[in-house]
């Protein structure tokens, strides 16, 4: 049995750790514990609960209303790891500056980033959005259509990214990708980047934007991008979406080819 004296000796260390990592404890509570309790009580998924909230509070056909309502849900009701409004502005700027025609999104989740991109793309542009989870894909489709974007603008593909990328040219007639948004499993970032390189679908000026490269992090992806000589790399520092105090960032890779 631990004596009171020893316990008291460790108390300052414990308090220091709690204070230092308090935002991570809050994230654990919001993203894991709250979700588990509400899943048990409601009998439906967190993503479906978010859709029901958006359906009740947002204006159909108004993409900004959809995004604002989603942000309110994620910041005040339940945490969902969307790109969020702050990092979303980085994405908005890239879209405005580059006017991509063909976009590949890896990790649709609930469709937040899909809606954010679709509202800013030029006429004739098309998004191929890939989501491997069937339930998430179903929710995303409802949110994307509620925002007013049809199949001509957004094609949702419910398959793993490593199956989709090699067949984009053959199955969908894609010749070049102007922008790729990576926001799926972080361990897939580097393998999928290699698949994109091998496919020949990224060319001079193609942009790969990868979210959450600081937290939870994609160190191998960043290391390769910086060392391979194929990309100009810029990391946009930010905080984790809907959370204070947890550093995060987005990596912007511009393909320049072999130097």
From Swiss-Prot:
<dbReference type="GO" id="GO:0005783">
    <property type="term" value="C:endoplasmic reticulum"/>
</dbReference>
<dbReference type="GO" id="GO:0050974">
    <property type="term" value="P:detection of mechanical stimulus involved in sensory perception"/>
</dbReference>
<keyword id="KW-0531">Neurotransmitter degradation</keyword>
<keyword id="KW-0489">Methyltransferase</keyword>
<dbReference type="InterPro" id="IPR002935">
    <property type="entry name" value="SAM_O-MeTrfase"/>
</dbReference>
<dbReference type="GO" id="GO:0016206">
    <property type="term" value="F:catechol O-methyltransferase activity"/>
</dbReference>
<dbReference type="GO" id="GO:0042424">
    <property type="term" value="P:catecholamine catabolic process"/>
</dbReference>
<comment type="function">
    <text>Catalyzes the O-methylation, and thereby the inactivation, of catecholamine neurotransmitters and catechol hormones. Required for auditory function. Component of the hair cell's mechanotransduction (MET) machinery. Involved in the assembly of the asymmetric tip-link MET complex. Required for transportation of TMC1 and TMC2 proteins into the mechanically sensitive stereocilia of the hair cells. The function in MET is independent of the enzymatic activity.</text>
</comment>
<dbReference type="Pfam" id="PF01596">
    <property type="entry name" value="Methyltransf_3"/>
</dbReference>
<keyword id="KW-1009">Hearing</keyword>
<keyword id="KW-1003">Cell membrane</keyword>
<feature type="binding site">
    <location>
        <begin position="107"/>
        <end position="108"/>
    </location>
    <ligand>
        <name>S-adenosyl-L-methionine</name>
    </ligand>
</feature>
<keyword id="KW-0333">Golgi apparatus</keyword>
<feature type="binding site">
    <location>
        <position position="161"/>
    </location>
    <ligand>
        <name>S-adenosyl-L-methionine</name>
    </ligand>
</feature>
<protein>
    <recommendedName>
        <fullName>Transmembrane O-methyltransferase homolog</fullName>
        <ecNumber>2.1.1.6</ecNumber>
    </recommendedName>
</protein>
<keyword id="KW-0949">S-adenosyl-L-methionine</keyword>
<dbReference type="GO" id="GO:0032259">
    <property type="term" value="P:methylation"/>
</dbReference>
<dbReference type="GO" id="GO:0007605">
    <property type="term" value="P:sensory perception of sound"/>
</dbReference>
<dbReference type="GO" id="GO:0006897">
    <property type="term" value="P:endocytosis"/>
</dbReference>
<feature type="binding site">
    <location>
        <position position="131"/>
    </location>
    <ligand>
        <name>S-adenosyl-L-methionine</name>
    </ligand>
</feature>
<keyword id="KW-0128">Catecholamine metabolism</keyword>
<dbReference type="GO" id="GO:0031223">
    <property type="term" value="P:auditory behavior"/>
</dbReference>
<dbReference type="GO" id="GO:0032502">
    <property type="term" value="P:developmental process"/>
</dbReference>
<dbReference type="InterPro" id="IPR029063">
    <property type="entry name" value="SAM-dependent_MTases_sf"/>
</dbReference>
<dbReference type="GO" id="GO:0005794">
    <property type="term" value="C:Golgi apparatus"/>
</dbReference>
<feature type="binding site">
    <location>
        <position position="83"/>
    </location>
    <ligand>
        <name>S-adenosyl-L-methionine</name>
    </ligand>
</feature>
<keyword id="KW-0808">Transferase</keyword>
<dbReference type="GO" id="GO:0016323">
    <property type="term" value="C:basolateral plasma membrane"/>
</dbReference>
<keyword id="KW-0209">Deafness</keyword>
<keyword id="KW-0472">Membrane</keyword>
<dbReference type="GO" id="GO:0060122">
    <property type="term" value="P:inner ear receptor cell stereocilium organization"/>
</dbReference>
<comment type="similarity">
    <text>Belongs to the class I-like SAM-binding methyltransferase superfamily. Cation-dependent O-methyltransferase family.</text>
</comment>
<dbReference type="GO" id="GO:0042417">
    <property type="term" value="P:dopamine metabolic process"/>
</dbReference>
<dbReference type="GO" id="GO:0035315">
    <property type="term" value="P:hair cell differentiation"/>
</dbReference>
<feature type="region of interest" description="Sufficient for localization to the Golgi apparatus">
    <location>
        <begin position="1"/>
        <end position="45"/>
    </location>
</feature>
<dbReference type="GO" id="GO:0048884">
    <property type="term" value="P:neuromast development"/>
</dbReference>
<keyword id="KW-0256">Endoplasmic reticulum</keyword>
<feature type="binding site">
    <location>
        <position position="105"/>
    </location>
    <ligand>
        <name>S-adenosyl-L-methionine</name>
    </ligand>
</feature>
<feature type="binding site">
    <location>
        <position position="113"/>
    </location>
    <ligand>
        <name>S-adenosyl-L-methionine</name>
    </ligand>
</feature>
């Amino acid at each position: 049995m631990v004596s009171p004296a020893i316990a008291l000796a460790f108390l300052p260390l414990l308090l220091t750790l709690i204070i230092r990592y308090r935002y991570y404890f809050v994230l654990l509570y919001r993203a894991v514990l709250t979700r588990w309790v509400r899943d048990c009580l409601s009998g439906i998924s967190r993503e479906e609960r978010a859709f029901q909230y958006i359906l009740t509070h947002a204006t159909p056909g108004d993409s900004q209303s959809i995004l604002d309502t989603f942000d309110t849900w994620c910041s005040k009701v339940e945490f969902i790891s969307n790109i969020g409004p702050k990092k979303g502005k980085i994405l908005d700027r890239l879209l405005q500056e580059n006017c991509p025609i063909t976009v590949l999104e890896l990790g649709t989740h609930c469709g937040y980033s899909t809606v954010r991109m679709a509202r800013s793309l030029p006429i004739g542009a098309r998004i191929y959005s890939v989501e491997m989870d069937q339930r998430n894909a179903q929710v995303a489709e409802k949110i994307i259509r509620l925002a007013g974007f049809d199949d001509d603008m957004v094609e949702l593909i419910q398959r793993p990214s490593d199956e989709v990328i090699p067949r984009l040219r053959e199955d969908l007639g894609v010749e070049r990708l102007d922008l790729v948004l990576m926001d799926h499993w972080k361990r897939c970032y580097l393998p999928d980047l290699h698949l994109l390189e091998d496919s020949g679908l990224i060319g001079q000026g193609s942009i790969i934007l990868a979210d959450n490269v600081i937290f939870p992090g994609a160190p191998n992806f960043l290391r390769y991008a910086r060392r391979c000589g194929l990309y100009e790399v810029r990391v946009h520092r930010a905080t984790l979406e809907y959370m204070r105090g947890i550093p995060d960032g987005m990596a912007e890779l511009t393909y320049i080819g072999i130097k």
